């Protein structure tokens, strides 16, 4: 029973659009009643109806240590005692900036903001200001936040301008946003051939987290780096999801590619609202007050958020942190796949350290957006609700990645696998491949 969640959801819809403050939370993609959470600890969520869930959302990625980690809570509590916001510099800003640069050497200077959207939006403004060019290239299926210039659908052909994907976004705002195909270098090269003198930057997720985790092919990212070098454009990695999750140095360290700018978020705030963008010194020096490109924020560098973020990043330096996280992720995903195969369930998966994507499809590998959107959404909805009913909380969307934390143990992973095995063994026939 979810009586209290249902009552709160009904009440919330009187005061907030859709009853939520971020659309995916409304369960619109899966149906049913969104769970209202009252407490979280380690790998678990507890809702207002006192039901406990193994959590594979992790607040959409920030909670790499698990919920309510003692070191993070202590750091935030100590910071709160000194005040919630100063509107002035604090020492922890310097400490966090230095640690970010230590983890990601491509970031020689960094600017703190309050969200991933602010980070990508500001990085693009900086790229345009530095290059004196107006156009940017993004990729179909990659999500970089809700800034107007990034809410774009692909046009009717590879060389067309983008079209707004949301009412309220003026056509003129997105006409400088060019859309290419992820993992298709030829589509990018074609845009450069036509608009070579106008392209300020490419922005890309090195591992795309909002089309159910599709990693870039290594030669694809290498090719993007080479095209940017050739045409004098900047390469921006959106590592809001992957930064400090897939590796201490982010996805860029796995691919051994140095972007000009990097957008960060989620983990760097330890669960607090934080984003950041940084990169080469000579580029970052063009930001005000040193340079002419303006960007500011009342709550940027908030002392409580800086303390929580600093405490989180320090924990990531523990011995074998990432090898242990990767091992747990692999145990979970390979266990799911083996159970799906045994039950003849059409399922494939992509995963990296601490993050995974499940797609109900008979295709063995999913490497393109077109493949991801052709996954069976109805199968996912059924799977999602069966998991939820059995105490496992997944992202309420067939296109969102799942996350696993350092707080998850083999106990939680194995319990999850037992639940999945049972679900697959009794699932409706429409979940099975014909044999």
Swiss-Prot record:
Q: CDD domains annotated for this entry?
A: OAT_like
Keywords tagged on the record: Cytoplasm, Isomerase, Porphyrin biosynthesis, Pyridoxal phosphate
- What's the main place this protein lives? cytoplasm
Q: Name one GO molecular function term.
A: pyridoxal phosphate binding
Q: Which residues cross the membrane?
A: none
Q: What class of enzyme is it?
A: isomerase
Indicate where the modification N6-(pyridoxal phosphate)lysine is found in the sequence: 266
Protein localization: Cytoplasm
One matching Pfam family is: Aminotran_3
Query: Per the UniProt entry, what is one GO biological process?
Result: protoporphyrinogen IX biosynthetic process
Reaction(s) catalysed by this chain's protein: (S)-4-amino-5-oxopentanoate = 5-aminolevulinate
Required co-factors: pyridoxal 5'-phosphate
Pathway, per UniProt?
Porphyrin-containing compound metabolism; protoporphyrin-IX biosynthesis; 5-aminolevulinate from L-glutamyl-tRNA(Glu): step 2/2
Q: EC number(s) per UniProt? A: 5.4.3.8
**Per the record, GO CC terms?**
cytoplasm
UniProt family annotation: Belongs to the class-III pyridoxal-phosphate-dependent aminotransferase family. HemL subfamily.
Instruction: Identify the NCBIfam families for this entry.
Output: hemL, PRK00062.1
Quaternary structure, per UniProt, is: Homodimer.
Record-given protein name: Glutamate-1-semialdehyde 2,1-aminomutase
Q: Name the lineage.
A: Bacteria, Pseudomonadati, Pseudomonadota, Gammaproteobacteria, Legionellales
